[in-house]
């Protein structure tokens, strides 16, 4: 039975660049991923704070299977999913903290978003799209309509809400516009929404 499982779901390595740094990520390793991702992002910002930089920090959490570090286990009062959300929130806060520490926050666009709604086949421990209908894998609003937070003190007014529709594919042309970077020559589907 274990060999059949491995054929369908082989062990997942941890890769940095093109190098496998951990060939078989254990459950304990996954408990530490959010902290490790955060530490690496903070370290990158520290090292590159004197020049323009781009950090893309996608978390593997809150995708199932869910794992959380000991510092956040049982802390949210909302079960494992809540604990994982609390740790991801902490991670975003750490990145914002280092931006403030080096006075980079007024010259940095910080974006926090999701790629899809909750996995409904995992029950209530995978989140909720309420009040929207359905979740991941559907074309209903609960599956494809996601929140996005953008933080840029001095440029984006605090507590402002944009109700214009946009998609994550719009991030590349928008960021390129803001940074005066050249877009690829081939056609892309996104649009500058600034």
Predicted regions and their residues:
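Short, solvent-exposed loop/turn and secondary-structure capping segments
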Residues: 1, 25, 65-72, 121-128, ...
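Acidic, His- and aromatic-enriched active-site or binding-groove loops in soluble protein domains
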Residues: 1, 85-88, 130-136
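Formylglycine-dependent
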Residues: 1-53, 59-68
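Solvent-exposed loop/turn segments at secondary-structure junctions
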Residues: 20, 29, 60-64, 90, ...
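A long, amphipathic alpha-helix that forms part
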Residues: 32, 36-45, 69-108, 125
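Short, solvent-exposed turn/loop segments enriched in Gly/Ser/Thr/Pro and often Arg
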Residues: 55-65, 112-120, 189-191
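Substrate-binding rim/cap in mid-to-C-terminal beta-strand-loop elements of soluble/periplasmic
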Residues: 12-22, 93-102, 121-122, 128-187, ...
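Loop/turn elements at helix/coil->beta-strand transitions in domains of secreted/extracellular proteins
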Residues: 49-55, 104-110, 145-146
């Amino acid at each position: 039975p274990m060999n059949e499982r491995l054929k369908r779901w082989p062990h997942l390595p941890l890769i940095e660049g093109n190098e496998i740094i951990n060939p078989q990520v254990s459950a304990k390793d996954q408990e530490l991923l959010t902290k490790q991702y955060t530490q690496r992002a903070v370290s990158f910002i520290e090292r590159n704070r004197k020049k323009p930089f781009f950090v893309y920090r996608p978390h593997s959490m809150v995708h199932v299977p869910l794992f959380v570090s000991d510092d956040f286990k049982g802390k949210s009062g909302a079960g494992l999913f809540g604990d994982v959300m609390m740790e991801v929130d902490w991670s975003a806060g750490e990145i914002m903290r280092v931006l403030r520490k080096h006075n980079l926050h007024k010259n940095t666009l910080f974006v926090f978003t999701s790629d899809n709604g909750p996995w409904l086949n995992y029950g209530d421990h995978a989140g909720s799209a309420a009040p929207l209908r359905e979740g991941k894998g559907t074309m209903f609003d609960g599956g494809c309509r996601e929140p996005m937070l953008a933080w840029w003190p001095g440029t984006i007014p605090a507590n402002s809400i944009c109700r214009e529709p946009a998609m994550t594919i719009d991030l590349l042309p928008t960021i390129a516009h803001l940074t005066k970077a050249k877009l690829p020559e081939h056609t892309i589907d996104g649009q500058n929404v600034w």
